[in-house]
Amino acid sequence: MLSTSNISDVNYYLNTKYFSLAREQLLDDKQFAGSLIHDLLIDQKFNKEDFTNLCKGKITTANGEYIELGRKNKDGELEHDMGRDLTFSAPKSVSLQHNMEGGDKRIKKALFTATKETLDYIERNYTFTRIKDESGKIKLIKTGNFSASLLYENLNRNLEFDDHIHCTIFNATKRPDGNIRSL
């Protein structure tokens, strides 16, 4: 199953009780993904600081250039849409099979593999940004790159077994001219 939502609060992913409980036990179950990650000055391993900065559109490129993405509002303050959360969930029966004593450990690997393949397809085929053409009109151009994080959880909010992966797609992409802009 797949559900989607806007990322509206960084702390939801980092501080929620059930997220924190699962993350303490499963430190290797989170990672950055997407081809844009290679152009950014971040550790390939997941960490809270890089996750927070990517959500807020505060990016340092591998060349050391600092970029702050967003649009200025009427008060002159920068506003940035953090991105999207795509949540890939295994069926309940599969989650139970995986999490029971002596459960099949291949299930989590299969969930990660399927999620990564789907995310790669989305990145290649559905990643766009806006650009002004010579006449000043705004048009969409395909970029084929983004940055994301994969956060595995085995519990839902009710602390029931529910294997799922949150794919947070950050609101940033690299245009063909090399500039990093919002999706």
Predicted features along the sequence, with ranges:
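Intrinsically disordered, flexible peripheral segments
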Residues: M1-D163, T168-L183
